[in-house]
């Protein structure tokens, strides 16, 4: 931790300005200067983690290799940095409070009155320092907006850290909005000025202003912001909208963000090697080919629920010089008459609950019968089994016990005890609490030879991430396989991890979530081959 330098990223004016992408972009530039870099996300909500939050409330829950259910921004960090992060890279107010209360119960505070300062702020600082071990730089994104009640003690902890570590070890970057008033054709800086004033009132002074704006800022506006916010003019970085989030590091580099960073940290001039990155971004922005993927989901009112999967399709497309267009198909309304004209492949993602299930099953049946390339992920694979049992084997009562505990043919069921990734026995029942009771994190999968999965991964054993409670019931396996639906992937205790259909261009189901390991620089192999199959069909 001694060598680590810290860049804290806060947000002002309003939420959803792109602090996560900004943090990822800064980290990417520093990483391409051959530094050891990581990112930490602080979430100011009181939930322990987002695991039990509705996707429509929070967006996607991203699962790390060590089984943590985290904020979707952790997914951005992994995809930009092309490295695995852990539960150390995300914490919530709920976790902070739980730790402090647990320590108090153990008597670790020697009978003192427990207060926000110093006990809560000390726990925050401890976690930040712990995440910085072995690094040159730790970028810390603070969720929420300056002025929110929930974020006050995080800003206090940042103030204290800067005092403890010294100015040469800490930079504060404030992401803010420069709104454009169309009627007067003006960009307004007043919201930024007020946001910085509030931040400074709380004891934190920004050294870099990252100004989100729909239009470029001229020198006079930059000078005005610099003067009113007490930063140097080259520390006002304009972040206009880009055609791809992966173009943001290039934009920041062009805007000169590394100049104030190097100056503040007493570093030589920074020269990131971005040629390979630039090539991939060019293929995203101006691809030679196009495919259309029918995405059958039920959380379509907030597409951030499927963020990693959307990005995984973009990664595969970039490596195939292909624009992947998504045709959003609401599973609640999908039926045998739904128009699939121009759709090159069908994707059925993971999910929870009974709503929209029959529409997904119908989409799978059409992909099977119409020879459309198909990829089913987690629940998507489970429903492929249900569809096959109902419509090929004639088991009309086939279902998952998630939706009907008394179904006639429970082809998907709840395993009440299993070994977790640490080889510890876990027990779960239909009455178990929802939080943290799933099969979570990275597990090994043995791939059968001569399968589409082996062709994609090019090795007999892989590791992929899971997030589910229900498993495929092996009782009916022989009946499926006699009809051409083969099991091609096995996990520990012979759990069924992957299936594929014979005599079909591409019909694959996987119990794991391949999207969680896809990166711009290294797309997930099975998603890459899925897009290849769609491209061949188109």
Swiss-Prot record:
Keyword Metal-binding: yes
Binding site for CTP: 15, 148-150, 188-193, 224
Binding residue positions for Mg(2+): 73, 141
Region (Amidoligase domain), start-end ranges: 1-267
Pathway given in the UniProt record: Pyrimidine metabolism; CTP biosynthesis via de novo pathway; CTP from UDP: step 2/2
Pfam families: CTP_synth_N (PF06418), GATase (PF00117)
Binding annotation for L-glutamine: 351, 379-382, 402, 469
EC number: 6.3.4.2
Active site: 378 (nucleophile), 513, 515
Family in the record: Belongs to the CTP synthase family.
Quaternary structure (record): Homotetramer.
Family annotation (NCBIfam families): PRK05380.1 (NF003792), PyrG (TIGR00337)
Protein name in the entry: CTP synthase
Taxonomic source organism: Helicobacter pylori (strain J99 / ATCC 700824)
Gene name of the encoded protein: pyrG
């Amino acid at each position: 931790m001694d060598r680590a330098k810290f860049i804290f990223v806060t947000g002002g004016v309003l939420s959803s300005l792109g602090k996560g992408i900004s943090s990822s972009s800064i980290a990417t530039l520093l990483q391409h200067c051959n530094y050891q870099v990581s990112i930490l996300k602080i979430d100011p909500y009181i939930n322990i983690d987002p695991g039990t939050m509705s996707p429509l409330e929070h967006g996607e829950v991203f699962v790390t290799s060590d089984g943590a259910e985290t904020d979707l921004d952790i997914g951005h960090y992994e995809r930009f940095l092309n490295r695995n992060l852990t539960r150390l890279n995300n914490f919530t107010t709920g976790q902070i409070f739980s730790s402090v209360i647990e320590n108090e119960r153990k008597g670790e505070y020697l009978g003192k009155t427990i207060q926000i300062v110093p006990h809560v702020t000390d726990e925050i600082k401890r976690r930040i320092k712990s995440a910085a071990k072995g690094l040159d730089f730790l970028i810390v994104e603070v969720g929420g907006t300056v002025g929110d009640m929930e974020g006050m003690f995080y800003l206090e902890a940042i103030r204290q850290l800067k005092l403890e570590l010294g100015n040469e070890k800490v930079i504060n970057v404030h992401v803010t909005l420069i709104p454009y008033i169309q009627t007067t054709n003006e960009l307004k800086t007043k919201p930024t000025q007020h946001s910085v004033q509030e931040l400074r009132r709380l004891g934190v002074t920004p050294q870099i202003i990252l100004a989100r704006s729909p239009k470029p800022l001229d020198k006079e506006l930059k000078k005005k912001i610099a003067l009113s916010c007490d930063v140097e003019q080259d520390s006002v970085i304009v972040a206009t909208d880009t055609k791809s989030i992966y173009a943001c590091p290039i934009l920041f580099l062009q805007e000169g963000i590394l100049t104030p960073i190097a100056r503040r940290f007493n570093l030589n001039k920074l020269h990131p090697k971005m040629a390979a990155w630039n090539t991939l971004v060019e293929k995203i922005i101006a691809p030679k080919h196009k495919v259309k993927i029918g995405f059958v989901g039920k959380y379509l009112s907030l597409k951030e629920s499927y963020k990693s999967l959307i990005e995984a399709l973009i990664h595969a497309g970039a490596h195939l010089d292909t624009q992947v267009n998504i045709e959003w198909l609401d599973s609640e309304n999908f039926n045998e008459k739904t128009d699939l004209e121009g759709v090159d492949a069908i994707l059925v993602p993971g999910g929870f609950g009974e709503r929209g299930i029959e529409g997904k099953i119908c989409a799978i049946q059409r992909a099977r019968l119409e020879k459309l390339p198909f990829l089913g992920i987690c629940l998507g694979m489970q429903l492929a089994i249900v569809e096959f049992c109902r419509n090929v084997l004639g088991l009309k009562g086939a279902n998952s016990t998630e939706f009907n505990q008394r179904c006639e043919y429970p082809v998907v069921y709840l395993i009440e005890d299993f070994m977790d990734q640490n080889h510890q026995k876990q027990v779960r029942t239909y009455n178990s609490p929802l939080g943290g009771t799933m099969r979570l994190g990275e597990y090994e999968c043995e791939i059968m030879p001569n399968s589409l999965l082996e062709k994609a991964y090019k090795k007999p054993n892989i590791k992929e991430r899971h997030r589910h409670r229900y498993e495929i019931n092996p009782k009916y396996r022989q009946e499926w396989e006699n009809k051409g639906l083969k099991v091609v992937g096995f996990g520990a205790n012979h759990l069924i991890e992957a299936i594929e259909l014979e005599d079909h261009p591409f019909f694959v189901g996987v119990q794991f979530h391949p999207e969680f390991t896809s990166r711009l620089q290294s797309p997930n192999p099975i998603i890459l081959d899925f897009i290849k199959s769609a491209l061949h069909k188109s």
